């Protein structure tokens, strides 16, 4: 198994799909990384040479991924909470942040229904 950005990349998958195992790299960014490094998208990870894997490591290292990205997201949400702005209040109350309706729907964000006690 190849190890990129502290993550074991699955050997049996194509390069583009395998790169998406890294938090912060989706299909579009994975395709861009393959294009820059000159590695074909349909080649499986186990078929890559050590130099090609090293190229992938260098290219992925240019982006904020994994723990750093998770920390960045957490800190930005914490900053909103500390500011006390509208978005921060929505995060604090576990409600949708981006203006979705809450009279109906929003069950994922609000959690299971709480019965009314009589």
From Swiss-Prot:
One of its GO terms (molecular function) is structural constituent of ribosome. The keyword RNA-binding applies. The keyword Protein biosynthesis does not apply. One of its GO terms (cellular component) is cytosol. Coiled coil: none annotated. Transmembrane segments: none annotated. Pfam families: Ribosomal_S13 (PF00416). GO terms for biological process: translation. Keywords: Ribonucleoprotein, Ribosomal protein, RNA-binding, rRNA-binding, tRNA-binding. It comes from the Bacteria. InterPro entries: Rbsml_uS13_C, Ribosomal_uS13, Ribosomal_uS13-like_H2TH, Ribosomal_uS13_bac-type, Ribosomal_uS13_CS. Residues 94-118 are annotated as: Disordered. Located at the top of the head of the 30S subunit, it contacts several helices of the 16S rRNA. In the 70S ribosome it contacts the 23S rRNA (bridge B1a) and protein L5 of the 50S subunit (bridge B1b), connecting the 2 subunits; these bridges are implicated in subunit movement. Contacts the tRNAs in the A and P-sites. PANTHER family: 30S RIBOSOMAL PROTEIN S13/40S RIBOSOMAL PROTEIN S18, SMALL RIBOSOMAL SUBUNIT PROTEIN US13M. Part of the 30S ribosomal subunit. Forms a loose heterodimer with protein S19. Forms two bridges to the 50S subunit in the 70S ribosome. Belongs to the universal ribosomal protein uS13 family. This is Small ribosomal subunit protein uS13. It comes from Actinobacillus pleuropneumoniae serotype 5b (strain L20). The gene is rpsM.
